């Protein structure tokens, strides 16, 4: 609600009705274009058996030929995500950290996504990391092969500039 109040021009796209002024995703896939930004959405399987029924979509954003993949909380190595990407080159993949800490997830990144840049997010803050997730994410990132640029968002409000 704060985002909408501060940015009244924003367009919210969600899989369930949450706000009065939003677009609701429905069906297996959707496409939306706003001012030159092309957005492809695909229903994906949510990670975790207890969340399988939660509506979840991945998204490929494209602007001026630059493609960004946001897979969100999709299942590790989801074949639907592989199909969704197809042969499209991915310039930047925003990747939820747990998916890159296991071999199956790293292999999927290397073989199916093949991004030029990978930004790993959703890591706990250092004072909240009682299970060692940050160290596991750093180790997993170091084991990725064939991804030219891997970055981890480890600090609050961290900013990265891609070149």
PLM ranges: what are they?
Residues 40-42, 95, 120:
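Redox-cofactor binding/interface segments in oxidoreductases and associated redox assembly factors
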């Amino acid at each position: 609600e704060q985002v909408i109040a501060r940015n009244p021009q924003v367009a919210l796209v969600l899989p369930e009705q949450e706000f009065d002024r939003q677009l609701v995703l429905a069906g297996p896939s959707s496409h939306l274009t706003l001012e030159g930004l092309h957005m492809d959405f695909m229903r994906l399987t949510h990670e975790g058996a207890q969340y399988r029924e939660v509506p979840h979509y991945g998204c490929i954003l494209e602007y001026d030929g630059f493609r960004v993949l946001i897979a969100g909380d999709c299942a590790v190595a989801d074949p639907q995500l592989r199909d969704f990407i197809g042969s499209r080159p991915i310039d930047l993949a925003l990747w939820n950290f747990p998916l890159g800490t296991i071999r199956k997830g790293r292999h999927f990144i290397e073989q199916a996504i093949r991004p030029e840049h990978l930004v790993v997010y959703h890591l706990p803050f250092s004072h909240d990391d009682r299970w060692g997730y940050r160290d596991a994410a750093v180790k997993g990132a170091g084991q990725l092969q064939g991804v030219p640029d891997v970055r981890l968002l480890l600090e609050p409000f961290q900013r990265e500039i891609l070149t």
